[in-house]
Amino acid sequence: MLATDSDPIVAIATAAGRGGIGVVRVSFGRGGEAAALPLIDALCGQKLAPRHASYVPFLDEHGAPLDRGIALYFPAPHSYTGEHVLELQGHGGPIVMQLLLQRCLDAGRGFGLRLAEPGEFTRRAFLNDKLDLAQAEAVADLIEASTEAAARSAGRSLDGAFSRQIHALVDDVITLRMLVEATLDFPEEEIDFLEAADARGKLAKIRAQLAHVLGDARQGALLREGLSVVLAGQPNVGKSSLLNALAGAELAIVTPIAGTTRDKVAQTIQVEGIPLHIIDTAGLRETEDEVERIGIARTWSEIERADVVLHLLDSRNGMTADDETIAARFPGGVPVVRVLNKTDLTGVAACVEHPAAEGDLTEVHLSAKRGDGIDMLRAELLRIAGWQAGAEGVYLARERHLIALRAAQEHLAQAADHAEQRAQSLDLFAEELRLAQEQLNAITGEFTSDDLLGVIFSRFCIGK
């Protein structure tokens, strides 16, 4: 906890720009009631009943109204931050909001009121045990949600669904640790611990439970982050037409002239609530045109960062020598789907062909021009992403959550190995359980550095 975490803070809590309502929020920190009551009197000219909406004038330093609106006073600990909080809801014009903000700062100068940093109100809520860290992150995720599914999942995380799963895992790990460490503390008790306490059975159940949580978290991360899909291939194979077909709109220029697309064209579409970030790129070929060469270099950069590459071919020509050269340069760790476009010119029915042998690629035959096979391609992208259609109860998760869950999974696997070696490895068994617990606690913030908190809350908007 930093020294500044107890400062009184103020910020405009609503989005920039004009609106029907604007909100200025004050959290009084260490100032408490001694700071709150004089500020309320200076701004509102009267006392406020706790947790009641009062329609009052917002007064300047001379007692003249700056605005009129709703004032709400929340004494600690019954507030968003867990501190004494004042919210002033006025008209949402930027000038009015700035005047009201400055009035708060001037009136609160005597007790050290300052502007809040990004995410500082939610940071206070975390530090005062109103939210755990996973719930605090869900606040930002709910604000930033780009799909209905992502918003609903963020709401479940904010409600504590993810945190409850983590706490249940931690409780089970702690229970098992207690059994192991009790045996280590009393070696004179000649009890076969592993058999009597069914330690291996308990560990197996914890590992299965963790695998389930990790699976749900992967689904949640997919809802939050989406999938980056790069369209790559030679010129004139229909990449821009495919982008337009996937998006359902004319986003990219389509002509028979090779090299029309010289820089990337990106569009995010939603498929079953999953954001697919589709990137149309310059056609891959040898060229003397400097502008086109720059576009091709950017294409390869996008391919290296992609989650999936769609390698487009002209179905009339199949896999040519130039296509083989392109395919040989694809990064080894990036999934590639071979898309044979223009089936309207060959008479081949739209279909998906999954690999018959290891090392082969999935092939999708389609016509971007007519739209044949586009739904099949969307379904294939979701399959590659690992999305389970109709998954209920998914909560939004972040990459740091996945990293912590995978690390905990690895520590539990090591613990299982030590359990198989029986009593001679009980101390190592206990240590791996401790490390797994540490990783799980980091998700909810029970074991977290100030540096990590700074990174997480700096990404919030000011006033939240």
Curated annotation (Swiss-Prot):
Residues annotated to bind GTP: 236-241, 255-261, 280-283
Binding site for (6S)-5-formyl-5,6,7,8-tetrahydrofolate: R25, E87, K130, K464
Alphabetized UniProt keyword annotations: Cytoplasm, GTP-binding, Hydrolase, Magnesium, Metal-binding, Nucleotide-binding, Potassium, tRNA processing
Record's GO cellular component terms: cytosol
Statement: the UniProt record of this protein carries the keyword Metal-binding: yes
Compartments it resides in: Cytoplasm
Chain positions recorded as Mg(2+) binding sites: S240, T261
Assembly and oligomerization: Homodimer. Heterotetramer of two MnmE and two MnmG subunits.
UniProt name for this protein: tRNA modification GTPase MnmE
Species annotation: Burkholderia lata (strain ATCC 17760 / DSM 23089 / LMG 22485 / NCIMB 9086 / R18194 / 383)
Gene: mnmE
